[in-house]
Swiss-Prot record:
The lineage of its organism: Eukaryota, Viridiplantae, Streptophyta, Embryophyta, Tracheophyta. This is Cyclotide mech-4. One of its GO terms (biological process) is defense response. Belongs to the cyclotide family. Bracelet subfamily. Probably participates in a plant defense mechanism (Potential). Binds to and induces leakage in phospholipd membranes, particularly ones containing 1-palmitoyl-2-oleophosphatidylethanolamine (POPE). The presence of a 'disulfide through disulfide knot' structurally defines this protein as a knottin. Disulfide bonds join C5-C21, C9-C23, C14-C28. Keywords: Disulfide bond, Knottin, Plant defense.
Amino acid sequence: GSIPCGESCVYIPCISSLLGCSCKSKVCYKD
């Protein structure tokens, strides 16, 4: 599933990618 990480990635990458989040549709999600 895709859980929103509460972070957008329109201008900058997901800082929460350190926690396993990735950018999808301008919003960071965790798979």
